[in-house]
Amino acid sequence: MSDTQHQVNVRVDTRYLPEQSAPEQNRFAFAYTVTIENRGEVSAQLLSRHWIITDGDGRTQEVRGAGVVGEQPLIAPGAQHTYTSGTVLATRVGSMRGSYQMLGSDGVAFDAAIPVFRLAVPGALH
């Protein structure tokens, strides 16, 4: 059975930040811009986030917290919310994935999956 009430799509674009990186110190900074689109039939508020960040050596870090960049946006049906944040890795490549914990205006809590996306210094991958 498909839940048409609660459908949230997440897209992510990334970029390497050379001006904030120090490769000689194994510090590689990345920005990511997330677009959260509410394709459901009810408004949905983003309450919290859960990230799983993995570097190129397989080291994993989990991050949990309220909202995103200090906000807990309420996203109407058909609307979207976009924000930019960042992370620092100790390797030239890595990945992130996770989920947002959402609350529909109908009182139903649900998770919106954040598909895995790659972080990579340009030219690091063939």
Swiss-Prot record:
HAMAP family in UniProt: ApaG
GO terms classed as biological process: error-free translesion synthesis
InterPro entries: ApaG_domain, ApaG_sf, Uncharacterised_ApaG
The protein's name: Protein ApaG
Pfam families: DUF525
Organism for this UniProt entry: Pseudomonas paraeruginosa (strain DSM 24068 / PA7) (Pseudomonas aeruginosa (strain PA7))
Superkingdom per UniProt: Bacteria
Domain ApaG: 2-126
